[in-house]
Amino acid sequence: MKYILLILACIIACVYGERYCAMQDSGLQCINGTNSRCQTCFERGDLIWHLANWNFSWSVILIVFITVLQYGRPQFSWLVYGIKMLIMWLLWPIVLALTIFNAYSEYQVSRYVMFGFSVAGAVVTFALWMMYFVRSVQLYRRTKSWWSFNPETNAILCVNALGRSYVLPLDGTPTGVTLTLLSGNLYAEGFKMAGGLTIEHLPKYVMIATPSRTIVYTLVGKQLKATTATGWAYYVKSKAGDYSTEARTDNLSEHEKLLHMV
């Protein structure tokens, strides 16, 4: 594949101008004429020249990038998932810095059209970055969970049991929620949320918080085996509003706990 790219580069770039040639017995050198020993040649500063010299490095970088994107999930590896989150957090400030630097460099050489595009890119990048922070703060306000600042988190499932609030990040808001109890361990969406629970500890309602509202899911059915603390409970949407998902331990009724506002 490397030689195919180099041959194509030679065909495109050798038509005119000063050329670089990849020699059989020497490194890259600039020549002004045709040399029979030249395998491939290409125009100085061309993208193909960059690929010809850095294709292996870029292939390694892209392999790592694809691996992080493909397997950057908690069920595969928390380490890879952490690297993925770090990359996503750093992309916004890096892109913003690049657009600002490009705007400055274009202004210095009086290329005002590109300067305008660079400024527009910087403004859009900054606006999108601020939108991420606003939505994350809104979600944190409802859940008090640091999962709110995960770039992939669009909603958070909150289950109150034993006076604590157990959370699980979600991609969206489902129609129903199923909680599974296996030998005292509570699971949702295939992930373990809590341990040491019994049938009596399963709540009458669960909540899913989004940046704009909190959706309450009410228990409509369950099947449990008391001897092994195993079973399931199913919840469906019942109402939505500006509710907090924090667990309450004071002397309030179930209805009051449900409706206490942020």
From Swiss-Prot:
Sites where a glycan is attached: 32
Cystines in this chain: none
Cellular localization per UniProt: Virion membrane; Host Golgi apparatus membrane
Virion surface side: 19-47, 99-112
Pfam families xrefs: CoV_M
Primary location group: virion
Topology in membrane: Multi-pass membrane protein
InterPro entries, alphabetized: ALPHA_CORONA_M, M_CoV
UniProt keyword annotations, A-Z: Glycoprotein, Host Golgi apparatus, Host membrane, Membrane, Transmembrane, Transmembrane helix, Viral envelope protein, Viral matrix protein, Virion
Region (Interaction with N protein): 237-252
TM region(s), chain numbering: 48-68, 78-98, 113-133
A GO molecular-function descriptor: structural constituent of virion
Domain of life assignment: Viruses
Gene Ontology terms: cellular component: host cell Golgi membrane; membrane; viral envelope; virion membrane
Topological domains, Intravirion: 69-77, 134-262
Binding partners and assembly: Homomultimer. Interacts with envelope E protein in the budding compartment of the host cell, which is located between endoplasmic reticulum and the Golgi complex. Forms a complex with HE and S proteins. Interacts with nucleocapsid N protein. This interaction probably participates in RNA packaging into the virus.
Protein family: Belongs to the alphacoronaviruses M protein family.
Role according to the record: Component of the viral envelope that plays a central role in virus morphogenesis and assembly via its interactions with other viral proteins.
Protein name (record): Membrane protein
Protein species of origin: Feline coronavirus (strain FIPV WSU-79/1146) (FCoV)
Gene: M
